[in-house]
Regions:
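Extended catalytic cores of very large enzyme megasubunits
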Residues: 2-431
Length: 431
């Protein structure tokens, strides 16, 4: 579309011509040059090809009107992308236009580092310590075949939000200049190579995920083919031993898994309850809450490689005598030192508890320091051990089962947390 299109009046033509003579942009090398209005218009028109309902001239003129003298070319590119995205509420195809404009920016960023093929992208990653040795050798051995596999036009399948997320969080970046060293298609093929044993397998998988018909989980996308190929989404950890060494070792385990985008599920049943005797110091325990507060801060600090917040869920048995304090952890009121806003919470419920809820019977709460064996039992073995401990009178206190169940339901309704998970059903089906 020419700049003198009938939809642009004489005044607009004159104003854009004046812009081209008075406005300048700063190139990557620092030089200033006059704004080339026609170049901006042509760039938007190319990306708008085949998108019904999209007016490229509208985007171009709005972009030009938003320029300031001395803006960098990167700021100009970002302005055109944001301008397109602003029109998405009027016409959904502007999302694809914004995505295509962003794709050209990504491509330019990669090529400005003298990366013109998939194998060169991987070589750069190897040089910077980002790519694992097995994938490096795999790509070097099959470079020509893998390079020929890339289908750049598949970038056009992205909507804007999807491609922006890929650009911001998933593409590998140079450790020093923070520029991306792979395009979306290089990224997909790198993931495929990390999951494959031969070139044909990698190519088939690349074609599947680059078509967006299927995508692996985020940790796989983050880490496949890299020097830290931790690709599982979730890790379930047993309760730490009831000691300083045991608790801090579990903190370390969780931090290392979270570092490479693993979500954590961890039990906390073995840690002694509030008021329990600490024989080493002859003091009394503060219970599980201070430990979970520390874990909450750790999860927030180790933010999955800077890509997103860490995620962890703590499970607690319903017979633990700190269960009521546990259910208050996500409340928005109360002592902030006894609240954990980053952790997720889950109740680990035996069938015996639900039977007592149904019958409106009492439920006994125990200090795990006195009944350490209950943690590892389920089904009939748990029931007999629980009843034996109850008959021996070693519980801390008793409450109506329905009262505790009501607190669980209230916590779940008010905070969306305190998930209901069933110990016996889970173990009987999995073990």
């Amino acid at each position: 579309m020419a700049l003198t299109d009938e939809r642009i009046g004489d005044t607009d033509v004159e104003s854009t011509e004046n812009t081209s003579t008075t406005m300048r942009v700063r190139k990557r090398n620092g030089d200033l040059e006059a704004v080339d209005v026609n170049k901006i218009v042509r760039a938007v028109e190319r990306c708008a090809d085949g998108l019904p309902g999209v007016d490229p001239m509208r985007v171009a003129t709005r972009t030009i009107s938003g320029l300031c003298d001395g803006a960098t070319t990167e700021e100009l590119d970002e302005l055109s992308i944001r301008t397109s995205a602003a029109f998405i509420v009027e016409e959904p195809n502007y999302s694809r236009l914004a995505a295509r404009l962003l794709a050209t920016v990504v491509d330019k960023e990669v090529r400005n580092q003298d990366i013109h093929s998939f194998s060169q992208s991987v070589a750069m990653g190897v040089e910077q310590g980002l790519i694992g040795p097995e994938v490096a050798e795999f790509v070097a051995t099959n470079a020509r075949k893998l390079n020929d596999t890339i289908e750049d036009e598949r970038d056009h399948l992205f909507e804007f939000f999807g491609l922006r997320t890929v650009y911001d969080r998933y593409l590998l970046r140079h450790p020093e200049n923070r520029m991306v060293i792979e395009t979306p298609q290089y990224f997909f093929l790198r993931v495929a190579c990390g999951l494959s044993t031969c070139p044909d397998e990698a190519i088939r998988f690349y074609r599947l995920i680059s078509s967006l018909a299927y995508l692996p989980s985020s940790p796989t996308l983050f880490n496949s083919g890299t020097s830290h190929p931790q690709m599982s989404s979730c890790y379930l950890l047993d309760s730490p031993e009831d000691s300083l060494d045991g608790i801090y070792k579990r903190y370390t385990d969780i931090a290392k898994l979270s570092k490479f985008a693993g979500g954590i599920g961890v039990a906390w049943h073995r840690i002694r309850a509030k008021g329990s005797l600490i024989r080493g110091t002859n003091g009394l325990s503060n219970g599980i809450i201070p430990w979970l507060k520390t874990l909450d801060s750790s999860v927030a600090a180790v933010n999955q490689g800077g890509r997103r917040k860490g995620a962890a869920c703590v499970y607690l048995e319903s017979w633990h005598s700190d269960i009521e304090d546990f259910l208050d952890l996500k409340e928005n009121t109360g002592d902030p030192q006894r609240r954990t806003h980053n952790l997720n919470l889950a109740n680990w419920i035996p069938d015996l508890f639900m039977e007592r809820v149904e019958k409106d019977w009492q439920w006994s709460l125990f200090d795990p320091a006195k009944v350490p064996h209950l943690t590892d039992l389920y089904g009939s073995d748990f029931e007999s051990a629980y009843l034996k401990a109850e008959e021996a009178g070693i519980y801390e206190r008793q409450i109506p089962a329905r009262e505790l169940y009501s607190r669980m339901m209230r916590s779940l309704a008010q905070t969306g947390n305190g998930w209901m998970t069933f110990k016996d059903a889970s173990n009987l089906k999995c073990n």
